[in-house]
A protein has these predicted regions:
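Non-catalytic RNA-recognition surface used by pseudouridine synthases
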Residues: 1-58, 64-212
Length: 214
């Protein structure tokens, strides 16, 4: 798929009517906050986001514009990839953590959504394609995870701690990929806002670069 070729045949207004902007979500705002900010800044009727990120979680948050909002349902089950830091509450080696992961937390797993989640707390099956330890610093472990959409990483970390009988919790998390969208193609809010201001002043060059035709 040649996105640039697709863009050539569309006006900026057509892209805004049926396009997607891959936002690099900062920490603290909710996913809805980001979606609403994009809507108000662009002056479009409707926006929606592909896969919710907790307020403290950063990274890839594709925002659908107007008619593209109908596509969000098709992206919910897409694989997601994360990099994060977890703290294990006891002294353990990388090898011990990797052993526990390989025994219980790769492939098809059972997971119950956390208490704070908005979905029904019912056990469900999810697939973990990758859960790797990248680095260790004291009791803090940097990890990479590639999972089926709808997998709760915070719960994955907590369940790992329970399984090891050490306890564990997540310190930081960043989504680096959501389906076909990755962080290399994401746009921070400062650059987005600047591009919209330029568009409103008659220069749509930077904004066009940011919109992916749906």
């Amino acid at each position: 798929m040649n996105i640039e070729k697709m863009k050539e045949n569309k006006t900026t207004e057509e892209l805004l009517e049926f396009g997607i902007i891959n936002i690099d979500k900062p920490s603290n705002p909710t996913s809805f906050d980001i979606s609403d900010f994009v809507r108000k800044k662009l002056g479009v009727k409707k926006t929606g986001h592909f896969g919710t990120l907790d307020p403290k979680v950063t990274g890839v948050l594709p925002i659908a514009l107007n008619r593209a909002c109908k596509l969000t349902v098709f992206f919910l089950g897409e694989d997601k990839e994360y990099i994060g830091i977890m703290k294990i509450h006891d002294e353990v080696s990388v090898e011990e953590v990797e052993r526990a992961i390989s025994e219980k937390f790769l492939g098809k797993i059972k997971q119950t959504p956390p208490k704070k989640s908005r979905v029904k707390r019912q056990e469900r099956e999810r697939e973990v394609k990758k859960f790797e330890i990248v680095e260790k610093n004291g009791n803090d472990f940097v990890f990479l995870a590639d999972v089926q959409g709808g997998t709760y990483i915070r719960k994955l970390v907590s369940d790992l701690g329970d399984y090891m009988k050490t306890g564990a919790h997540m310190l930081e998390l960043r989504r680096i990929r959501a389906g076909i969208f990755n962080e290399n193609g994401s746009v921070n809010l400062y650059d987005f806002e600047k591009a919209v201001d330029e568009y409103k002043s008659g220069n749509d060059k930077e904004l066009r670069k940011m919109i992916i035709p749906a």
